[in-house]
């Protein structure tokens, strides 16, 4: 049994790892690795606190969100705005620009949505050099990776937009550094949802898995690419390959936390799903003021927003069940990702500086 699995088993029997064990584990760990680019130290504050040198009230917008975080709701609101051309998930494998490939299916949980592809109607399939890897491979991209085809595709969408362009992504989480480097004049908005509700919402065709399920026994239906994301990202975050004995929610939470780190570092604005559905007019009004979307809060669709999908996690397990597993995941990330990885010199950090980050789970509970 390898070291990580020993820690997992031990953690299942105790709520936290003590400082003594912490020190002993660190002594057994390999030499500190170099963090992959994109995991920037956060001592300088959140990216949203730093002003970028372009007019965000007129600039194109890109939305980044985990699956089942309300991104379709936000996209629908923006789509209805007369001064906006809002593209739905450009990296979706259905290829919205290709009528023969995309089909006609619309998710019944996406209220008020008749199609996802109208904005793509002027784009010829022959003009896009589509790459299947965009959907599930190379999910992490540093700013140094060219990815010419992906760049050309996004540039094409921005250029084809009849109005101010908005691109709603669910596969940009770990590509944010690349995106911001390649498209420095595009504002980045992060939509965040409670990780518990977000995970439960991924069970669309099947009931949620048992509270005793593990990743190893495949006691759950993976409807939103959780395992494939873990496999791809484990090339950079080896911890994600050592999770067989954990509950599927814990894997979802780990990726959620890592996604949060990227967002905290790179985006210009964070919008909480819970605020959006509980206080839609105020929340959308603040978003509209920040990004110059005049009249967005007065769109008719705002009246149809409700908070029925908030805190559904309580029907699955009690708070202690979730807190125990989230605390264990936070500890594992601190031990094997954040605290154990040394920042590269080109980030201006001294040798031995450690990443410092805090969980923001409480903000959306």
Model-assigned labels for residue ranges:
Residues 168-170, 182-205:
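Conserved phosphate-donor/acceptor-positioning beta-strand/loop module used by diverse small-molecule
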Residues 1-61, 226-270, 276-365:
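PAPS-dependent sulfotransferases, especially Golgi type II membrane carbohydrate sulfotransferases
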Residues 102-106, 205-209, 288-290:
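Short, hinge-like loop/turn segments at secondary-structure boundaries
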Residues 70-84, 179-183, 201-203, 270-295:
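PAPS/PAP-binding and catalytic site of the sulfotransferase fold
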Residues 61, 85, 187-189, 269-271:
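Hydrophobic/aromatic beta-strand patches that form the interior of the parallel beta-sheet core
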């Amino acid at each position: 049994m390898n070291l990580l699995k020993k820690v997992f088993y031990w953690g299942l029997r105790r709520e936290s790892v003590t400082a003594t064990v912490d020190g002993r584990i660190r002594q057994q760990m390999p030499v500190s690795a170099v963090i992959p680019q994109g995991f920037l130290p956060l001592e300088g504050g959140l990216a949203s606190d730093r002003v970028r040198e372009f007019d965000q009230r007129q600039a194109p917008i890109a939305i980044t969100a985990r699956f089942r975080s309300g991104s379709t709701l936000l996209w629908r609101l923006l789509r209805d705005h007369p001064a906006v051309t809002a593209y739905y998930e450009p990296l979706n494998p259905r290829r919205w620009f290709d009528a023969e490939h995309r089909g006609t299916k619309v998710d019944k949980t996406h209220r008020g949505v008749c199609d996802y592809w109208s904005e793509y109607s002027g784009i010829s399939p022959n003009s896009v050099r589509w790459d299947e890897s965009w959907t599930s491979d190379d999910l992490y991209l540093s700013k140094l990776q060219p990815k010419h085809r992906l760049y050309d595709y996004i540039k094409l969408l921005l250029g084809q937009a009849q109005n101010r362009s908005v691109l709603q992504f669910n596969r940009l989480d770990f590509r944010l550094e690349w995106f911001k480097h390649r498209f420095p004049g595009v504002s980045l908005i992060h939509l965040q949802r409670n990780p518990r509700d977000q995970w439960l919402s991924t069970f669309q065709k099947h009931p949620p898995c048992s509270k005793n399920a593990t990743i190893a026994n495949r006691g759950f239906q993976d409807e939103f690419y959780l395992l494939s994301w873990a496999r791809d990202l484990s090339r950079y975050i080896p911890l994600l390959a050592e999770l067989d004995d954990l509950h599927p929610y814990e894997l979802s939470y780990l990726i959620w936390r890592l996604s949060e780190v990227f967002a905290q570092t790179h985006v210009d604005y964070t919008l909480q799903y819970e605020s959006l559905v509980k206080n839609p007019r105020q929340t959308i009004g603040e978003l509209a003021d920040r990004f110059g979307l005049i009249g967005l809060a007065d769109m008719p669709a705002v009246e149809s927003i409700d908070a029925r999908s908030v805190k559904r996690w309580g029907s699955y397990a009690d708070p202690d069940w979730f807190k125990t597993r989230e605390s264990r995941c936070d500890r594992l990330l601190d031990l094997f990702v954040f605290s154990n990885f040394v920042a590269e010199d080109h980030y201006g950090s001294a040798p031995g500086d450690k990443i410092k980050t805090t969980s923001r789970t409480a903000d959306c509970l």
